[in-house]
């Protein structure tokens, strides 16, 4: 759920990667089909159409991604960070740890008193 | 300064080179595929003998198939480059991610602090009860010299009887020269000052 926007784009790129694999697969199937004595024309047509569609889709998607990057890229490195809040959070956790330590000391003292 | 100004241009050229690579690779895939299909056609006999022609076609197909695979791999590389570029330079999503992380961490911190404060309130009450128990029990009499808490108490008024000593820690607590435990207990006493005596009464 976190980092949804960036993740979406990355996931789209992963889909494109898979589609590139599908392109090669389709091309291979088409050529394999051609090499057969009796070719199944329907299958051939379907695979060839899938191949062309995949290639066009990949090209369009990648063009769109590059166009988006042209829009957002400024050339300056990003300078924001979550370090300060992370530090604050760590301090809070340390406080809790320390409190727990002290409490366990108190508990030990109590037990000692009970034993005596 | 000059370097900073040069950077956007290089980004621009980088993106343009990405675009060029994309176009080249796609074109290469399509062209090579078409050529392979064309080569598959059996041509009429020419001056070149059948066997030679077949060998040549075989070789050409190998090369073209390798070209297609190379173009595909190049596209993969392009996608990975784009991913990297996206992670490094996609400011809107980077900002969003940082905001979300900040919110998460702040919520966690607030929860921690809230729990700590709740713990403090509980512990101050418990400590008060513990001390009460301790001063009214016999162990405080026999081990008075061992514990600084007790010591401070006894030093302050040594002749108080056991009924009065219940409220005595409250009086003794502001003493700055008191020992470690008492110092630690002092703020809790001042905090629990309100509910303390009423409970006691």
Curated annotation (Swiss-Prot), chain B:
Q: What is its main location?
A: nucleus
Q: Which Pfam families does this one have?
A: Med22
Q: Where in the cell is it found?
A: Nucleus
* Annotated stretches, region: Disordered: 166-201
Alphabetical keyword list: Activator, Coiled coil, Nucleus, Transcription, Transcription regulation
Q: Which InterPro entries match?
A: Med22
Q: How does it assemble?
A: Component of the Mediator complex, which is composed of MED1, MED4, MED6, MED7, MED8, MED9, MED10, MED11, MED12, MED13, MED13L, MED14, MED15, MED16, MED17, MED18, MED19, MED20, MED21, MED22, MED23, MED24, MED25, MED26, MED27, MED29, MED30, MED31, CCNC, CDK8 and CDC2L6/CDK11. The MED12, MED13, CCNC and CDK8 subunits form a distinct module termed the CDK8 module. Mediator containing the CDK8 module is less active than Mediator lacking this module in supporting transcriptional activation.
In Swiss-Prot or TrEMBL terms, this protein is called Mediator of RNA polymerase II transcription subunit 22
Q: Which organism is it from?
A: Bos taurus
């Amino acid at each position: 759920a976190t980092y949804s926007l960036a993740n979406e784009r990355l996931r789209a790129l992963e889909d494109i990667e898979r589609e590139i694999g599908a392109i090669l697969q389709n091309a291979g199937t088409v050529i394999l089909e051609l090499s057969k004595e009796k070719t199944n024309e329907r299958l051939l047509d379907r695979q060839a159409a899938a191949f062309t569609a995949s290639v066009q889709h990949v090209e369009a998607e990648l063009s769109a991604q590059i166009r988006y990057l042209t829009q957002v890229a400024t050339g300056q490195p990003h300078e924001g960070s979550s370090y300060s809040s992370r530090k604050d959070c760590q301090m809070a956790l340390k406080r809790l740890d320390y409190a727990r330590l002290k409490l366990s000391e108190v508990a030990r003292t109590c037990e000692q008193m009970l034993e005596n | 300064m000059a370097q900073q100004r040069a950077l956007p241009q290089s980004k621009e050229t980088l993106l343009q080179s990405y675009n060029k690579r994309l176009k080249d690779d796609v074109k290469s895939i399509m062209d090579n595929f078409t050529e392979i299909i064309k080569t598959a056609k059996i041509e009429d006999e020419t001056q070149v003998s059948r066997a030679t022609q077949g060998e040549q076609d075989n070789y050409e197909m190998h090369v073209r198939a390798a070209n297609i695979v190379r173009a595909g791999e190049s596209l993969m590389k392009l996608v990975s480059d784009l991913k990297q570029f996206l992670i490094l330079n996609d400011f809107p999503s980077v900002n969003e991610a940082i905001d979300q992380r900040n919110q998460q961490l702040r919520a966690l911190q607030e929860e921690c602090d809230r729990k700590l404060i709740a713990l403090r309130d509980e512990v101050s009450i418990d400590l008060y009860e513990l001390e009460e128990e301790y001063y009214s029990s016999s162990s405080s009499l026999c081990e008075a010299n061992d514990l600084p808490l007790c010591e401070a108490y006894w030093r302050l008024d040594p002749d108080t009887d056991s009924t009065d000593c219940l409220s005595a820690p409250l009086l003794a607590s502001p003493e700055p020269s008191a020992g470690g435990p008492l110092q630690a207990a002092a703020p809790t006493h001042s905090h629990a000052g309100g509910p303390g005596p009423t409970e006691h009464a």
